[in-house]
């Protein structure tokens, strides 16, 4: 059987269709990937980073059709595909805005949006198939010149609304069946921004969508410390998306449409989330919130802002816990500040998973990457946003999000997600226990001065543990009997004494290595190198508790036996130790 060490750069998880897990096997490969030098060598990759082969094939077919039927003077054209017109228009606007900001504006007519109709009224020849009575999909293609390729890719990567590989596969199947190819129509900007054409072409009437919304709403019951909530989350409070970043992007844009203002992020944020907040809207304030003094500073800043200032803060963003340093901010104090100044708290629970933490008592909106633990098999992209029915802003937010919502979760992806998530609580409990065991064992190496391993980062470790534990769910007995016990999650990070020790450890670590986490197999990644930051990013001081070190390796625990995982880690540590000289 093929193991992780047998995989080369760009090889997907063996035997799993639509895998999100694609191997980036060495430290040098991760550095090259983060610098944008490895993606061209990879036929496969994480869907937001490397366009899937089926999507590329469909794009080539559509591009050829556009060029055969429409005059276009865009030099060296390429295209991206979206399931909604608003997403396509947002991509065009993003490319134009960035080019103007650099003082090298791209002519607007070089970037065009096309409506692409795939298939006829019967989308599938099999009468028993769930596509048999539905119309073929309508996609939206953004055609752009080669000079805009990096900006277009940045939108695809950070905003997350592109089509999935399953949707591309379905469209290619229809194109082959029909033989005539897709039908394309150029759209004016006014049309793509309009409310009637803005709706997604992907219907969400299939029962699987209600099943998923209901399942997620059931997990959002309130059991953490704090006052009981008057209303529990309903299925209608759950919005589904084609990725976690698509959820973040839509929530942020909806908040800006509802109330213009500056966003604040507290603690470390996932790098793509940070880029969305920085590039969309009037500005972003950053707070580390490592100490009470930091919170006091934020409180003072909020007290000084004017109530009707266009640059006043409108929302506070945070993660519970943060990725990849696994620290948790004082969410109860943030909630108090938000109530005092009529702000929103938007919290991302993707790293812990909502089987472990309950943020309904502190957040107006909870965002989750369903691609991670909820799915648990790294073979489908999805995300969700839950609106807290007890928020004073719930009605206004719900109206705004409903108006601008485009379903980007294809039905085949939704079906796979529903199947994968049936055993979510049991999987999460197993991973919690394994991860806590590994952390306990590895702490012994941290205590050894001869070990290159200097620190373990995990929610159960360090001074922010108390804040995480305030958000932990209480144990809950499910309908079929087993008691679901929350824990500290399946992600921990390791810091090493130097880059040489970290890179040697990583290169000798026999696990899957890639961009994702929260799967049924272990996944490791040097976070700073993976995200293109590395040594070039200035950090206040080594091993600062609120920043990711360039020696940090994030480790996501899977369902493998705990002793097997520990042995693999020990083998890599032994290799790292051979070249390590303890200071002093």
UniProtKB/Swiss-Prot annotation:
UniProt EC number: 5.1.1.1
Keyword list, A-Z: Isomerase, Pyridoxal phosphate
Catalytic activity, as annotated: L-alanine = D-alanine
A GO MF label: pyridoxal phosphate binding
InterPro entries, per the entry: Cys/Met-Metab_PyrdxlP-dep_enz, PyrdxlP-dep_Trfase, PyrdxlP-dep_Trfase_major, PyrdxlP-dep_Trfase_small, Trans-sulfuration_enzymes
Pathway: Secondary metabolite biosynthesis
Cofactor(s) of this protein: pyridoxal 5'-phosphate
Gene3D superfamilies: Aspartate Aminotransferase, domain 1, Type I PLP-dependent aspartate aminotransferase-like (Major domain)
A Pfam family assignment: Cys_Met_Meta_PP
Biological role: Alanine racemase; part of the gene cluster that mediates the biosynthesis of the unguisins, gamma-aminobutyric acid (GABA)-containing fungal cyclic heptapeptides with the amino acid sequence cyclo-(D-Ala1-D-Val2-L-Leu3-beta-MePhe4-D-Ala5-D-Trp6-GABA7) for unguisin H and cyclo-(D-Ala1-D-Ala2-L-Leu3-beta-MePhe4-D-Ala5-D-Trp6-GABA7) for unguisin I. Within the pathway, the alanine racemase ungC' catalyzes the interconversion of L-alanine and D-alanine, providing the D-alanine which is accepted by the first adenylation domain of the nonribosomal peptide synthetase (NRPS) ungA'.
PANTHER family in the cross-refs: CYSTATHIONINE GAMMA-SYNTHASE-RELATED (PTHR42699:SF1), PTHR42699
Similarity-based family: Belongs to the trans-sulfuration enzymes family.
UniProt protein name: Alanine racemase ungC'
Organism for this UniProt entry: Aspergillus campestris (strain IBT 28561)
Species classification: Eukaryota, Fungi, Dikarya, Ascomycota, Pezizomycotina
């Amino acid at each position: 059987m093929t193991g992780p060490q047998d995989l080369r750069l760009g090889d997907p998880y063996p035997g799993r269709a639509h895998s999100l897990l694609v191997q980036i096997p060495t430290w040098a490969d991760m550095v090259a990937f983060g610098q944008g030098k490895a993606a061209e060598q990879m036929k496969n990759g994480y869907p937001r980073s490397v366009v899937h082969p089926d999507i590329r094939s469909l794009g080539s077919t559509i591009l050829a059709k556009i060029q055969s039927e429409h005059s276009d003077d865009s030099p060296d054209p390429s295209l991206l595909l979206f399931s909604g017109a608003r997403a396509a228009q947002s991509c065009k606007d993003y490319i134009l805005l960035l080019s103007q900001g650099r003082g090298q504006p791209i002519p607007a007519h070089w970037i065009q949006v096309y409506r692409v109709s795939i298939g006829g009224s019967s989308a599938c020849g099999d009468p028993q198939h769930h596509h048999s009575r539905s119309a073929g999909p309508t996609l939206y293609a953004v055609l752009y010149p080669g000079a805009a390729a990096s900006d277009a890719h940045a939108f695809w990567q950070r905003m997350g609304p592109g089509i999935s590989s399953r949707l591309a596969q379905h469209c290619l199947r229809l194109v082959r069946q029909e033989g005539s190819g897709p039908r394309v129509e150029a759209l004016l900007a006014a049309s793509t921004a309009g409310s009637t054409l803005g709706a997604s072409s992907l219907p969400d009437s299939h029962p699987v969508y209600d099943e998923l919304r209901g399942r997620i709403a059931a997990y959002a019951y309130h059991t953490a410390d704090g006052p009981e909530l008057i209303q529990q989350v309903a299925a209608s409070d759950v919005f589904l998306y084609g990725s976690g970043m698509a959820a973040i992007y839509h929530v942020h844009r909806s908040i800006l449409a509802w109330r213009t203002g500056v966003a604040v992020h507290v603690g470390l944020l996932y790098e793509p989330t940070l880029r969305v907040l920085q590039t969309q809207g009037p500005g972003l304030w950053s707070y580390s919130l490592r100490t009470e003094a930091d919170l006091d500073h934020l409180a003072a800043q909020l007290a000084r802002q004017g109530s009707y200032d266009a640059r006043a803060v409108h929302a506070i963003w945070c993660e519970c816990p943060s990725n990849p340093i696994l620290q948790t901010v004082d969410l109860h104090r943030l909630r108090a500040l938000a109530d005092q100044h009529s702000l929103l708290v938007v919290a991302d629970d993707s790293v812990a998973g909502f089987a472990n933490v309950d943020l309904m008592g502190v957040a107006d909106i909870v965002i989750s990457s369903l691609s991670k633990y909820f799915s648990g098999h790294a073979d489908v992209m999805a995300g969700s946003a839950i609106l807290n029915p007890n928020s004073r802003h719930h009605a206004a937010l719900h109206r705004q999000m409903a108006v601008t919502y485009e379903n980007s979760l294809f039905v085949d992806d939704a079906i796979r997600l529903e199947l994968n998530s049936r055993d979510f609580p049991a999987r999460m409990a197993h991973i919690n226990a394994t991860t806590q065991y590994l952390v306990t064992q590895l702490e012994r190496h941290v205590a050894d001065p001869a070990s290159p391993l200097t620190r373990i980062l995990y929610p159960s470790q360090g001074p922010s543990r108390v804040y995480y534990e305030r958000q932990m769910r209480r144990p809950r007995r499910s309908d079929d009997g087993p008691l679901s016990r929350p824990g500290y999650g399946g992600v921990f990070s390791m810091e090493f004494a130097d880059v040489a020790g970290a890179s040697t450890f990583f290169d000798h670590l026999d696990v899957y290595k890639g961009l994702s986490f929260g799967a049924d197999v272990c996944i490791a990644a040097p976070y700073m190198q993976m995200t293109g930051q590395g040594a070039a990013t200035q950090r206040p001081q080594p091993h600062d508790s609120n920043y990711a070190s360039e020696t940090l390796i994030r480790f996501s625990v899977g369902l493998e036996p705990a002793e097997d995982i520990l042995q693999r880690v020990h083998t890599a540590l032994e290799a790292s130790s051979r070249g390590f000289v303890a200071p002093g």
